[in-house]
């Protein structure tokens, strides 16, 4: 393990300040109390991004459960959903649904559209791609760098799901695994990508290359629904401006070092480090919660620096 103290086990549980709001029970009259009022449920409105009627989804605690609910409303298979955006049907990478959902957000589900196979000549070490994933097994392109190798291939677009690399099916891979695979492709060789683009409405517009910064606030109300892979969802306050800025810096570092963007991963890393007193304790906490990522030491020190800057008001 890198960093001196990683061998020492540290408790890695993040403190949760918020709990799931179940609703308020009506105050009973004097005497024998009546039956409790049913819990107030959170209900969200959703549409298919290429066009559909409006549906209602509720009773979900994770991304996979949400996709299943949306699929049920629109009578499609959950596997047809590539990703969701909030409050816009456009393929806007600044509006991606991740692990947090504003209590008044409108959900647009982007489903599978045209399949395409593209041959790419890797003329540079870096392809100029930033990868993210939808949390349930689909990695897709979040950003294309101007002037990069991929930018010259106009059939490759932001939002395209990467299904295969050189014939190898990568469905189920996490974003960092896909980014690593692409980075390891040999320079000055041809490789093949099998992609699935989101189904589009009949509209014409320029190809998007980059989303907005990850410090953008999520949701239009004061609270957010935090979706988790394990355990119940919780309703939380929006992060402070300083916290959002620090999380945004961590997300930028993920892109710089690993070629991915993941605001939920950045948030998890921030939560793991906010109450630690030194980088060694932080590294131990990350090993216990996110050991599969095998983050390099230089990256961890830079992330620790971003967290420390927030603590010191910088």
Curated annotation (Swiss-Prot):
Give the keywords, sorted: Cytoplasm
Q: What is its main location?
A: cytoplasm
Pfam families per the record?
GIPC1_GH1, GIPC1_GH2, PDZ
Query: What's this protein's family per the entry?
Result: Belongs to the GIPC family.
Please tell me whether the keyword Cytoplasm is annotated for this protein: yes
Boundaries of every PDZ domain copy = 117-197
Task: From the UniProt entry, list the residue stretches annotated as the region Disordered.
Answer: 1-36
Output a single Gene Ontology CC term carried by this record: cytoplasm
PANTHER family on file: PDZ DOMAIN-CONTAINING PROTEIN GIPC2, RGS-GAIP INTERACTING PROTEIN GIPC
Q: Is the keyword Protease assigned to this protein?
A: no
What domain of life does the UniProt record list for this protein's source?
Eukaryota
Q: Where in the cell is it found?
A: Cytoplasm
The UniProt regions of compositional bias labelled Basic residues, in chain numbering, are 1-12
The protein's name: PDZ domain-containing protein GIPC2
The gene it comes from is Gipc2
Residues in coiled coil: none
Fetch the CDD domains from UniProt: GH2_GIPC, PDZ_GIPC2
Tissues/organs with expression: Expressed in kidney and lung (at protein level).
How this chain assembles, per its entry, is: Probably interacts with SEMA5A.
